[in-house]
Regions:
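Phosphate/Mg2+-binding loops and adjacent switch elements
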Residues: 99-166
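Phosphate-binding P-loop
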Residues: 1-4
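Fold-independent oxyanion-binding glycine-rich loops
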Residues: 12, 40-41, 50, 69-70, ...
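Phosphate-binding/switch loop-helix module in NTP-utilizing enzymes
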Residues: 78-105
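A generic local secondary-structure boundary/capping motif
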Residues: 25, 91, 122-125
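Glycine-rich phosphate-binding P-loop
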Residues: 7-29
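N-terminal phosphate/diphosphate-binding loop that engages ATP/GTP or pyrophosphate donors
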Residues: 23-88
Length: 166
């Protein structure tokens, strides 16, 4: 795996992971740091639309379909009978950037911040996981690691950038 700075955002469902990643991308790119994201999906997903040419290519058996336009390109790789690739296998497919924010991949070994909302009714992951370096919560918590207000995007960005060496 090439040298890439990676930082994760993990937490139980409905604890604000995606919203935090979204705000962090805006905040960090606004500071001149290039960012890509990697999102783990626990379910089948499809970026394509039935009936479109690219969908027809995939349904006909194409292993990969590369869709390009003047605005963006997207590569769809069909796993078929292959096992799900790990995080490191996917990271090498990204173009070089300063930082990759990863949403999900709780059990991977990279450093992470956990999102926590009291209303979600779930316990914290952090106490049993040393890779979780901080928690972003909507309620005050007493922990053995930094705790941020979930809405303190600037403070969380400062922490992450410091953690990865910026």
């Amino acid at each position: 795996v090439r040298d890439v700075r990676v930082y994760g955002v993990v937490g139980w469902k409905n604890t604000g992971k995606t919203g935090l990643v979204e705000r962090l991308v805006t905040e960090i790119t606004g500071r001149g740091v290039s960012v890509s994201t990697l999102k783990h999906a626990h379910h089948a997903f499809d970026l394509d639309q039935p009936g479109r040419d690219s969908h027809r290519h995939r349904m006909a058996g194409a292993r990969e379909v590369l869709l390009g336009s003047g605005k963006r390109w997207a590569l769809m790789h069909e796993l078929r009978e292959e096992p799900e690739p790990g995080m490191d296998e996917l990271l090498v497919r990204l173009a070089p950037v300063d930082l990759v924010l990863v949403e999900g991949y709780k059990s991977a070994g990279h450093a992470k911040i956990e999102t926590h909302r009291a209303a979600a009714g779930q316990g914290l992951i952090a106490p049993g996981d040393a890779t979780i370096r901080a928690v972003a919560s909507d309620v005050p918590l007493e922990l053995d690691r930094p705790v941020f207000n979930l809405d303190d995007t600037g403070g969380i960005a400062n922490f992450i950038l410091s953690e990865v060496g910026f």
